[in-house]
Amino acid sequence: MSKLIKGIAASDGVAIAKAYLLVEPDLTFDKNEKVTDVEGEVAKFNSAIEASKVELTKIRNNAEVQLGADKAAIFDAHLLVLDDPELIQPIQDKIKNENANAATALTDVTTQFVTIFESMDNEYMKERAADIRDVSKRVLSHILGVELPNPSMIDESVVIVGNDLTPSDTAQLNKEFVQGFATNIGGRTSHSAIMSRSLEIPAIVGTKSITQEVKQGDIIIVDGLNGDVIVNPTEDELIAYQDKRECYFADKKELQKLRDADTVTVDGVHAELAANIGTPNDLPGVIENGAQGIGLYRTEFLYMGRDQMPTEEEQFEAYKEVLEAMDGKRVVVRTLDIGGDKELSYLNLPEEMNPFLGYRAIRLCLAQQDIFRPQLRALLRASVYGKLNIMFPMVATINEFREAKAILLEEKENLKNEGHDISDDIELGIMVEIPATAALADVFAKEVDFFSIGTNDLIQYTLAADRMSERVSYLYQPYNPSILRLVKQVIEASHKEGKWTGMCGEMAGDETAIPLLLGLGLDEFSMSATSILKARRQINGLSKNEMTELANRAVDCATQEEVIELVNNYVK
């Protein structure tokens, strides 16, 4: 008899294969054992650190080939952990001062760090805790002489089952053999979930108990569309899911026919579908999925996973590469959006109680122009290689925009005096992610060239609800009428001044939100490249006039639930 296990759908698709249990190695040791040869124990610890660096470098290089530099940057962070004196020194001191064995010293110190990071109401720091756990486990395995599981050695068709997959586990998965995976813990934003989407393999996380309910070699189905795992399916279930898998692949193939199609409603209104990217390595997916531009080019990758600022030349090459590849299509580059939630040793950013409301993004750039000016110079120099738009993140006041624009114009003049060619067709815009900015959209619209609505932050700032907090996640409501009214206000203000508005938050690619946004008059929908073809098919089947009527009714609703019901009645 088959068994159904429910989890969180982390990556689309259907996988059918036998289970491969990722068995946790025995990393137990005598915590109370004292050592007499202190120097020898320190040397043992140092040797484990070096061996871990060698392994992680190999994994990092493999991840860059399979997943791109953006995802491989996780392992740059792991390597930095192994070089962090604030972590390494206390471990060595514990061995020397307390005669602790290397395994005890390592686990005691890293557990303290993990506990501190996990207690913070900050998703980035919680991810740092996961990084330290992963690195600590690798170092401990070398101290104890125990081999960690190596998913790269799998040479037959399997679905991996485990408590969790660490970033290094996921980076070693071979798509040829690993059909999918399912884990006890994790969420859609965990490292393993993000990487599974990059690898395009079905994944389900957060099942809570799958390792207790599945045996090695069981046949299992991973339904990444609905979050279901079926263990030892019946013949009928097997046939049904084989059909479902074939339909999924057929649908993907059918969607490819829309790659070069226009995005136009049944009543002839055009919309622009653009892609969000994190590095130039994301370009193949952008082109493959028929993006009509790039609506958000995040530039943080240039600053992460390193111990010094990127040079102007490094930045110039990264911007030039994307502009050339897009061949005249619009590329919207967001200037540095970073703050105290990210640990960059060379920036010496202050620790803050709430870094998401603190010294970050445009605030940091205006205050530390030695960071801002090289980025603007690199962007201006790259502007002649394509259609460049520049937008400033987290702008709260018109004076912030004016100051940023003045600095950019100053650097433009400097570059021209140095003999550089600069495009005269660069549009300057802002991210609308703060309610105050949306409230003054009519004021901003007179001075900016465009708006890009960042719904992820706009929603949590408007509803005062941390989207990463389980306790208040019910308040993170993309379809709340208050959000729809703000979006409408921004779009109408831009159109009144002959400007355009895009959206680059998750809402832009959401199938419930798309009819509403179309009706509100959104000009550009920017989303994950893998969502573009589905969105194109959806928009091409909608009537702009009908969606305008829908949107006008939606903004008069009282609750998110009413809005969803309204959309479902309009779009069947």
From Swiss-Prot:
Known InterPro entries for this protein? PEP-util_enz_mobile_dom, PEP-utilizing_PTS_enzyme, PEP_util_AS, PEP_util_C, PEP_util_CS, Phosphohistidine_dom_sf, PTS_EI, PTS_EI-like
Localization in the cell? Cytoplasm
Gene3D superfamilies membership: Phosphoenolpyruvate-binding domains, Phosphohistidine domain, PtsI, HPr-binding domain
Q: Where is the active site?
A: 191, 504
PROSITE patterns, per the entry: PEP_ENZYMES_2, PEP_ENZYMES_PHOS_SITE
Needed cofactors: Mg(2+)
Keywords from UniProt, A to Z, are: Cytoplasm, Kinase, Magnesium, Metal-binding, Phosphotransferase system, Sugar transport, Transferase, Transport
Q: Which GO terms describe its biological process?
A: phosphoenolpyruvate-dependent sugar phosphotransferase system
- Tell me the residue numbers annotated for binding phosphoenolpyruvate: 298, 334, 456-457, 467
EC number assigned by the record: 2.7.3.9
Query: What are the binding positions for Mg(2+) in this chain?
Result: 433, 457
One Gene Ontology term of the molecular function aspect:
phosphoenolpyruvate-protein phosphotransferase activity
Reaction(s) this enzyme catalyzes, per UniProt = L-histidyl-[protein] + phosphoenolpyruvate = N(pros)-phospho-L-histidyl-[protein] + pyruvate
Cytoplasm: present as a keyword of the record? yes
Record remark: domains: The N-terminal domain contains the HPr binding site, the central domain the pyrophosphate/phosphate carrier histidine, and the C-terminal domain the pyruvate binding site.
Which family does this protein fall into?
Belongs to the PEP-utilizing enzyme family.
Describe its assembly.
Homodimer.
Q: What is this protein's function per UniProt?
A: General (non sugar-specific) component of the phosphoenolpyruvate-dependent sugar phosphotransferase system (sugar PTS). This major carbohydrate active-transport system catalyzes the phosphorylation of incoming sugar substrates concomitantly with their translocation across the cell membrane. Enzyme I transfers the phosphoryl group from phosphoenolpyruvate (PEP) to the phosphoryl carrier protein (HPr).
Q: Which PANTHER family match?
A: PHOSPHOENOLPYRUVATE-PROTEIN PHOSPHOTRANSFERASE
In its miscellaneous comment, the UniProt entry states:
The reaction takes place in three steps, mediated by a phosphocarrier histidine residue located on the surface of the central domain. The two first partial reactions are catalyzed at an active site located on the N-terminal domain, and the third partial reaction is catalyzed at an active site located on the C-terminal domain. For catalytic turnover, the central domain swivels from the concave surface of the N-terminal domain to that of the C-terminal domain.
Know the name of this protein? Phosphoenolpyruvate-protein phosphotransferase
Species: Staphylococcus aureus (strain Mu50 / ATCC 700699)
